[in-house]
Swiss-Prot record:
<feature type="binding site">
    <location>
        <position position="104"/>
    </location>
    <ligand>
        <name>S-adenosyl-L-methionine</name>
    </ligand>
</feature>
<dbReference type="GO" id="GO:0005829">
    <property type="term" value="C:cytosol"/>
</dbReference>
<feature type="binding site">
    <location>
        <position position="58"/>
    </location>
    <ligand>
        <name>S-adenosyl-L-methionine</name>
    </ligand>
</feature>
<protein>
    <recommendedName>
        <fullName>Ribosomal RNA small subunit methyltransferase A</fullName>
        <ecNumber>2.1.1.182</ecNumber>
    </recommendedName>
</protein>
<dbReference type="InterPro" id="IPR020598">
    <property type="entry name" value="rRNA_Ade_methylase_Trfase_N"/>
</dbReference>
<dbReference type="GO" id="GO:0052908">
    <property type="term" value="F:16S rRNA (adenine(1518)-N(6)/adenine(1519)-N(6))-dimethyltransferase activity"/>
</dbReference>
<keyword id="KW-0698">rRNA processing</keyword>
<feature type="binding site">
    <location>
        <position position="79"/>
    </location>
    <ligand>
        <name>S-adenosyl-L-methionine</name>
    </ligand>
</feature>
<dbReference type="GO" id="GO:0003723">
    <property type="term" value="F:RNA binding"/>
</dbReference>
<keyword id="KW-0489">Methyltransferase</keyword>
<dbReference type="InterPro" id="IPR001737">
    <property type="entry name" value="KsgA/Erm"/>
</dbReference>
<keyword id="KW-0949">S-adenosyl-L-methionine</keyword>
<dbReference type="InterPro" id="IPR011530">
    <property type="entry name" value="rRNA_adenine_dimethylase"/>
</dbReference>
<feature type="binding site">
    <location>
        <position position="31"/>
    </location>
    <ligand>
        <name>S-adenosyl-L-methionine</name>
    </ligand>
</feature>
<dbReference type="InterPro" id="IPR020596">
    <property type="entry name" value="rRNA_Ade_Mease_Trfase_CS"/>
</dbReference>
<feature type="binding site">
    <location>
        <position position="33"/>
    </location>
    <ligand>
        <name>S-adenosyl-L-methionine</name>
    </ligand>
</feature>
<keyword id="KW-0694">RNA-binding</keyword>
């Protein structure tokens, strides 16, 4: 198929939207990509080949789905907007390796879908242009569920991509960085200007790649408690670790006790949460956890 016939061009996208009298729903964060080269970059970074399978979230009118269908073995796309189903049937009609599921990804049993649609042991990648308003819940569900997928390569708001891939002592580093990086290795592979979308959003985007870890990079006694400690440490970014944790443990440990536990963990209480590595947070959480039942 020649490039000008691809869905992801301004003229073809306008034709499809006009044919179906489609209007964008702001509540669903619908912004369609109209630059084929950006899509092909996503496919390349995602490592999609004819041996791999792909899961897409929010296919829209099928621009990314089409590129996945061309390059992957099998594609399953989750679409929540019923109005798009007949459009997808039309635009993707020639691709026999695409299945569209009308379901909210947050309610889907993705592991079951993988088992039912893909070959046993096949390498699976999640590839998506995610709606900005629900990016974090979707990604956190997918990585916390520890799906049998190799990576997630997603187009998201640049600011969120920076936060998810943030490193200690940077403005973007916080509890979200640590949550994402506990389950995956995160890196921004490409920045994408807002001009390549229809309608044009107010912000620029980035392509973020999350490579799933087989094991977390740190050992923690209790995962929930570990993430509670992290959240508490960033509750007020300008405050010290000691002050934030004193507030968190109010009625349980006084300031003196918190100082003592932090010393035992080998971390100075005068530091701020943004300066701690994941290893240091694990040490702090594991040390405090020992005192939970004392």
């Amino acid at each position: 198929m020649t490039t000008n016939k691809y869905i992801a061009t301004p003229s073809r996208t306008k034709d499809i939207l006009g044919k179906y009298h489609f209007t964008f729903k702001k509540s669903l964060g619908q912004n369609f990509l109209v630059d084929v080269s950006v899509l092909q970059n996503i496919i390349r970074h995602a490592g999609i080949t004819k041996d791999t399978a792909a899961i897409e979230i929010g296919p829209g009118i099928g621009a990314l789905t089409e590129q996945l269908a061309i390059h992957a073995d099998q594609v399953v796309a989750f679409e929540i907007d019923q109005r798009l189903l007949p459009i997808l049937q039309d635009t993707l009609g020639e691709y026999s390796n695409v299945s569209v599921i009308h379901q909210d990804i947050l309610k889907a049993d993705v592991t079951k879908v993988i088992d039912e649609h893909f070959k046993e042991g096949q390498e699976v990648h999640v590839v998506a242009n995610l709606p900005y308003y629900i990016t974090t819940p979707i990604l956190m569900k997918l990585i916390r569920d520890r799906l049998p997928v190799t990576s997630l390569t997603v187009m998201i708001q640049k600011e969120v991509a920076d936060r998810m891939s943030g490193e200690p002592n940077s403005k973007s580093y916080g509890s979200l960085s640590l949550a994402v990086q506990y389950y995956s290795e995160a890196k921004v592979v490409m920045n994408v200007p807002k001009q390549v979308f229809m309608p044009q959003p107010n912000v620029d985007s980035s392509i973020l790649q999350l490579t799933m870890r087989k094991q977390p990079p740190v050992e923690v006694t209790d995962e929930d408690f570990f993430f509670e400690i992290i959240q508490a440490s960033f509750a007020q970014r300008r405050k010290t670790l000691k002050n934030n944790l004193t507030r968190f443990f109010k009625g349980v440990h006084d300031k003196e006790k918190i100082d003592h536990i932090l010393q035992e963990a080998g971390v100075e209480g005068i530091r701020r949460g943004e300066s701690l590595t994941m290893e240091e947070f694990a040490q702090v959480a594991n040390t405090f956890y020992q005192y939970q039942s004392k």
